[in-house]
Swiss-Prot record:
InterPro entries in the record: Fatty_acid_hydroxylase, Sterol_Desaturase_Related
Cited function: Involved in sphingolipid trihydroxy long-chain base (4-hydroxysphinganine) biosynthesis. Can use C18- and C20-sphinganine as substrates to produce C18- and C20-phytosphinganines (D-ribo-2-amino-1,3,4-trihydroxyoctadecane and -eicosane).
Domain of life: Eukaryota
Protein name listed in UniProt: Sphinganine C4-monooxygenase 1
Motif interval(s): Histidine box-1: 114-118
UniProt remark on domains: The histidine box domains may contain the active site and/or be involved in metal ion binding.
Pathway where it operates: Membrane lipid metabolism; sphingolipid biosynthesis
Protein topology in the membrane: Multi-pass membrane protein
Biological processes, Gene Ontology terms: photomorphogenesis; sphingoid biosynthetic process
Gene (name only): SBH1
């Protein structure tokens, strides 16, 4: 006799984004040899980055453990949403509203926290500079942060977007998996033809690559979805995407910004 095995929405909401992170990163690792679509060459990646890939993996795993613990606590405190799911009929419009609300909340939280970590010299030196050891970003380095930064920016930001939007644990499975894919894509270091994220969002791998360069650290703080706060508050750095002579692409800021 076969025994049923039920997996709760809360468990999936905790585990799915972590699994999605490594699966989607793995796709970009497989594509990283495509020099004609890279924003930096492999040589630049090896020479400019200030941290080993093994250290990056360890750092990401630490953050994901913290992320999982906070998610479990959050679901425990808010309680099971099973009864609410039965009582409430979710329409597409309700789900769309929750997604958009969560996206705006997450973007707002991350913009101001991210910008403050650049402006506060102590926080930048001791915490945020760890992420900027990756001058040439790559996919699975997206969540390579100091544990304190991971908690403040990503984990607490995610919890706020969950609570403010009013989404259920089941909806959160899809939202946080989507947010994870978007974050990985922004750090992938590739500009691939037909990438839907590049078509829909101005905040993309080229946009975020600018921020990782020395001349861009005061600009392009927005992540992971929109660029509205950069535009509103004057931290938007315009750029053009140019073909490199040795193959691939380069995100080049306008001259007046690069000389700033």
């Amino acid at each position: 006799m076969m025994m049923g095995f039920a997996v709760s929405d809360e468990l999936l909401g905790t585990v799915a984004p972590i699994v999605v992170y490594w699966l989607y990163s793995g796709i970009y690792v497989a594509l990283s040899s495509l020099e004609s679509y890279r924003l930096h060459s492999k040589v630049e990646e090896e020479e400019k980055n200030l941290v080993s890939k093994s250290s990056v993996v360890k750092g990401v795993l630490v953050q994901q453990v913290v992320q999982a613990v906070v998610a479990i606590l959050l679901f425990t405190v808010t309680g099971s949403d099973a009864e609410a799911d039965k009582a409430q009929q979710f329409s597409f419009l309700v789900l769309a509203r929750q997604f958009v609300t969560a996206m705006i909340v997450l973007d707002t939280w991350q913009y101001f926290m991210h910008r403050y970590m650049h402006q506060n010299k102590f926080l930048y030196k001791h915490i945020h500079s760890q992420h900027h050891r990756l001058i040439v970003p790559y996919a699975y380095g997206a969540l390579y942060n100091h544990p304190v930064e991971g908690l403040l920016l990503d984990t607490i930001g995610g919890a706020l977007s969950f609570l403010v939007s009013g989404m259920s644990p089941r909806t959160s499975i899809f939202f946080f998996s989507f947010a994870t894919i978007k974050t990985v894509d922004d750090h992938c270091g590739l500009w691939l033809p037909g990438n839907l994220f590049h078509m829909v969002f101005k905040n993309n791998s080229a946009y975020h690559d600018i921020h990782h360069q020395l001349y861009g650290t005061k600009y392009n703080f927005s992540q992971p979805f929109f660029v509205m706060w950069d535009r509103i508050l004057g931290t938007y750095m315009p750029y053009s995407l140019e073909k490199r002579e040795d193959g691939g692409f380069e995100a080049r800021p306008t001259k007046e910004f690069k000389d700033d």
